[in-house]
């Protein structure tokens, strides 16, 4: 069985990790053993935060819808309930955009929701 020299593969593996650690502070950017741990931890944060981003944006949309609904004299929950009863299926992302950039359209939706609740 021939002897396997691992210099090329080891160097490639080290380089791959050190390229990923580019921009890190201190020895995390140029010492392989430390950079490897930092890159692993960064990957864990990325994985976690990709999921958290979805939750945070939903919270932001709800806060914006709530603020706009309260300006029109409604709570968020009653506004959403009115929309559901009026069979208006608009997601929270679009509602938040309407609340920020197109107040008359949002007010029209709120009026429909109010009418549905009053009936």
From Swiss-Prot:
Of the GO CC terms on this record, one is: ribonucleoprotein complex
What SUPFAM superfamilies does the annotation carry? Ribosomal protein L20
Under the heading InterPro entries, the entry gives: Ribosomal_bL20 (IPR005813), RIBOSOMAL_L20_CS (IPR049946), Ribosomal_protein_bL20_C (IPR035566)
Q: Which UniProt keywords apply?
A: Ribonucleoprotein, Ribosomal protein, RNA-binding, rRNA-binding
Q: Could you tell me which Gene3D superfamilies the record lists for this protein?
A: 6.10.160.10, Ribosomal protein L20 (1.10.1900.20)
Recorded GO molecular functions are: rRNA binding; structural constituent of ribosome
Task: Report if keyword Oxidoreductase is assigned.
Answer: no
Q: Which residues form a coiled coil?
A: none
One Gene Ontology term of the biological-process aspect is: translation
Family membership:
Belongs to the bacterial ribosomal protein bL20 family.
Q: What does this protein do?
A: Binds directly to 23S ribosomal RNA and is necessary for the in vitro assembly process of the 50S ribosomal subunit. It is not involved in the protein synthesizing functions of that subunit.
Q: What is this protein called?
A: Large ribosomal subunit protein bL20
The primary gene name is rplT
